[in-house]
Amino acid sequence: MIPVILSGGSGSRLWPLSRKQFPKQFLALTGEHTLFQQTLERLVFEGMDTPIVVCNKDHRFIVNEQLANRKLECQRILMEPFGRNTAPAVALTAMMLVNEGRDELMLVLPADHVIDDQKALQRALALATVAAERGEMVLFGVPATRPETGYGYIKSTNDSLLPEGVSRVQQFVEKPDEKRAVEFVKSGGYFWNSGMFLFRASRFLEELKKHDPDIYDTCVLTLERSEQTADTVTLDDATFACCPDNSIDYAVMEKTQRACVVPLSAGWSDVGCWASLWAVNDKDIHGNVSKGDVVIQDSRNCMIHGNGKLVSVIGLDNIVVVETKDAMMIAHKDKVQGVKQMVSTLNDQGRSETQNHCEVYRPWGSYDSVDMGGRFQVKHISVKPGACLSLQMHHHRAEHWIVVSGTAEVTCDENVFLLTENQSTYIPIASVHRLRNPGKIPLEIIEVQSGSYLGEDDIERFEDIYGRSTPVERGVSVKTIAQ
């Protein structure tokens, strides 16, 4: 059995803590380790192969770093240039396995879910394996114990041909209003759709080809044109851009006659909103969850998350307060489903706070935006030992670098020289330059940018050891590409 970890997401539902370039699976929300790390760690047991991770190519270095931090392994990373939902991601993985002669069971799991009961998960997997070995397509359903409006539902029915404890999927139901959700819980036989699946690779491809041939055909061509190594699959941007955007549920599971459901009673949560995160965290005697430097007075059932500043609250009930360095979000706990719409509104306004935190992680290290004005920006840059930035040029800004600690190797046009603590240099506009850390300790510098445009997209790369490049134009038809 091969786990396939889907590590996509737009970072919108737990904004401002999650961002597009650092979505929630890479955050430590329910303990010391991140949701991504917890997902992989719960799959380390006998009979389970090392996983395949599917992620956005901009996240691949975060994935590698979080794997290394916990000494975790994955057999391959499949990198998408942009999201096309779950059906193409799983199809490409299944095709890759079948092409390699490994037509095995695929356990498809989101990277950002919480499962508290490991033994219950393994029992559900054992039952699901029996069904999947018979050619069934298994969906793990969480028994609906309360009228939850944030989940999709599955209506099940008995089928004597299935193993005991497994039921046939009768109907998929979109996220209901509260009245319908109450009816579902009262009537019984309804499950929350966990988004977790088990099926054989060839079975999924057979059903996908039957029910959504456009996705199937585009994925075949995408994989043929992708760059594959022993460790990674880098999808062809132009071909993948033509792939329809669809989920496993819509593309296959709602149409196939082989969909069945296995109950999963394992303390599952998709941590899909701030109310869900409040529910899975430890609380004080008044039902409050607090993180960071927080002082709570005369308040009940609140979620207060501080990230640097002192946050004090008085007389609040069922309120969520989330503070980060560059944004604050305050909402009633019953209204947190609206955070996604708020992020959409901010995106329409061109707000950068939805994309990145002030501290941004790169394969070579990180940078933190310290201050910004009309024609200047100040950054604190940290470069890992032995790492280097790309050989690059900016068309609209100059840069001043001041070394705070460590040693910097600077390339500026034809000149290459070293800087040590308290030394500085100037990088003129349109100069070809690079920063490298040749030392054994992190390199810390202060960068002062000045110019008419300071966006991160003002960059022309000439050499980059991490293989970063500008995305290709999208929207060309797959028929055109195939010619």
UniProtKB/Swiss-Prot annotation:
Reactions catalysed according to its record: D-mannose 6-phosphate = D-fructose 6-phosphate; alpha-D-mannose 1-phosphate + GTP + H(+) = GDP-alpha-D-mannose + diphosphate
Pathway it works in: Nucleotide-sugar biosynthesis; GDP-alpha-D-mannose biosynthesis; GDP-alpha-D-mannose from alpha-D-mannose 1-phosphate (GTP route): step 1/1; Nucleotide-sugar biosynthesis; GDP-alpha-D-mannose biosynthesis; alpha-D-mannose 1-phosphate from D-fructose 6-phosphate: step 1/2
CC cofactor note: Co(2+) (for PMI).
Alphabetical list of InterPro entries matching this protein: GMPP_N, Man1P_GuaTrfase/Man6P_Isoase, Man6P_isomerase-2_C, ManC/GMP-like_b-helix, Mannose-6P_isomerase_type2, NTP_transferase_dom, Nucleotide-diphossugar_trans, RmlC-like_jellyroll
Top-level taxon: Bacteria
Signal peptide start and end residues: none
Cofactor: Co(2+)
GO BP terms, alphabetized: alginic acid biosynthetic process; GDP-mannose biosynthetic process
E.C. designation(s): 5.3.1.8, 2.7.7.13
A molecular-function term among this protein's GO annotations: mannose-6-phosphate isomerase activity
Pfam families: ManC_GMP_beta-helix (PF22640), MannoseP_isomer (PF01050), NTP_transferase (PF00483)
Keywords noted in UniProt: Alginate biosynthesis, Cobalt, GTP-binding, Isomerase, Multifunctional enzyme, Nucleotide-binding, Nucleotidyltransferase, Transferase
PANTHER family: MANNOSE-1-PHOSPHATE GUANYLYLTRANSFERASE (PTHR46390:SF1)
Family (UniProt): Belongs to the mannose-6-phosphate isomerase type 2 family.
Quaternary data: Monomer.
Stated role: Produces a precursor for alginate polymerization. The alginate layer provides a protective barrier against host immune defenses and antibiotics.
Name of the protein described by the UniProt record: Alginate biosynthesis protein AlgA
Source species: Pseudomonas fluorescens
Higher taxonomy: Bacteria, Pseudomonadati, Pseudomonadota, Gammaproteobacteria, Pseudomonadales
